[in-house]
A protein has these predicted regions:
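Hydrophobic/aromatic residues within well-ordered alpha-helical segments
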Residues: 58-62, 66, 87, 94, ...
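Helix-turn-helix
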Residues: 11, 15, 19-53, 57
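Amphipathic alpha-helical linker/stalk segments
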Residues: 56-82, 123
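Short alpha-helical functional segments enriched in proximate histidine and acidic residues
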Residues: 19, 69, 90, 127
Length: 128
């Protein structure tokens, strides 16, 4: 008998990102994610005590992907222009993920001061 496939937290997060890309962040739930992984809902609920906890983890990963995407600028390009164009390009190429980041209410920062102090902003500011 072959060993059971192990479903990791990262696998769940990646599957949830795919659900968000295809259908929108509103459709991230235990059933849609487990269906994407071809498993029961048990592994999803094992790794995340609530669906909200899973959505927050997915949000953090999407935010990280967005930051990496924005920083893909060539050395000869003006950093401010490059970051701005990548911001727009991300919105065009990944509209569902862009909505998740900026319209879902899952943003960690609740004030301008928290946003400025965010570690994700350090490479953006360093490029300028």
């Amino acid at each position: 008998m072959p060993p059971k496939m192990r479903i990791t937290k990262d696998m769940i997060i990646n599957a949830a990102i795919e659900v968000a890309k295809q259908s929108g962040y509103e459709y991230i739930n235990a059933r849609t994610v487990s269906a994407r992984l071809h498993c029961s809902t048990q592994p999803v609920m094992y790794h995340f005590s609530t669906i909200d906890a899973m959505k927050r983890a997915v949000y953090a990963q999407v935010d990280h992907l967005h930051s990496e995407y924005m920083m893909r600028i060539s050395p000869e390009q003006d950093p401010i222009l490059g970051i701005g164009l990548n911001y727009i390009r991300f919105a065009v190429e990944e509209p569902q993920l862009f909505r998740y980041l900026f319209q879902s209410g899952y943003a960690v920062e609740h004030s301008l001061v928290e946003m400025i102090d965010s570690e994700e902003l350090i490479p953006v500011l360093a490029a300028m």
